A protein has these predicted regions:
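Transmembrane and membrane-interface helices of multi-pass
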Residues: 2-178
Length: 179
């Protein structure tokens, strides 16, 4: 007897897309939302964090079966950077900036150990643990986002073009501004 099983193509899931968006948005948008709610900034930071965090969907769309690995690698980097920024905000009440990086690289080991002894607290540890727990929870909810083959490339390119390439092209070639 000859068996002719037809393997069903995986279907697109709005729920899977929603979890992927929430996961990638979490790392940059949480701090921006806190800054907005506290009244220190407008909505531009939230808008930019939502838009540019969506770029992390490109590898997820191109390689849907590897979403957990891709999200874990990207997530660890985003988690470390965003946790540092969140802790800085909790300690100083302002956003992390380039001038902070300059000061950090000019710091010697004595100053660094003094800083850690002054600002390392239970509050920071609890915030870091809660932040990490939410990130892990969101990661466990991730499922492959299947977009049919020709469209996954179109959608990925549209994201890249709309968020990166078009603004660069407009500023460089039309407005004649430096990048």
């Amino acid at each position: 007897m000859h068996s002719t099983e037809v393997q069903a193509k995986p279907l697109f899931s709005w729920k899977a897309l929603g979890w992927a968006l929430l996961y990638f948005w979490f790392f940059s948008t949480l701090l921006q939302a806190i800054i907005y709610i506290s009244g220190y900034s407008g909505t531009n930071g939230i808008r930019d964090s939502l838009l540019f965090s969506s770029l992390w969907l490109i590898p997820v769309f191109l390689f849907p079966k590897r979403i957990k690995i891709i999200a874990a690698v990207i997530g660890v980097v985003l988690w470390a950077a965003s946790l540092a920024a969140l802790c800085y905000y909790v300690i100083y009440g302002q956003e992390f900036s380039q001038s902070v990086l300059f000061v950090m690289f000019e710091t010697n080991t004595n100053e660094a150990s003094e800083y850690l002894s002054q600002y390392f607290s239970l509050k920071i540890v609890l915030i870091a643990l809660a932040y990490t727990a939410v990130a892990v929870l969101l990661w466990t909810r991730l499922r492959p986002v299947y977009i049919p083959k020709p469209w996954r490339y179109v959608v990925s390119f549209a994201l890249l073009y709309g968020l990166i390439l078009h603004p660069i092209a407009m500023n460089t070639f039309i407005k004649k501004q430096a990048v």
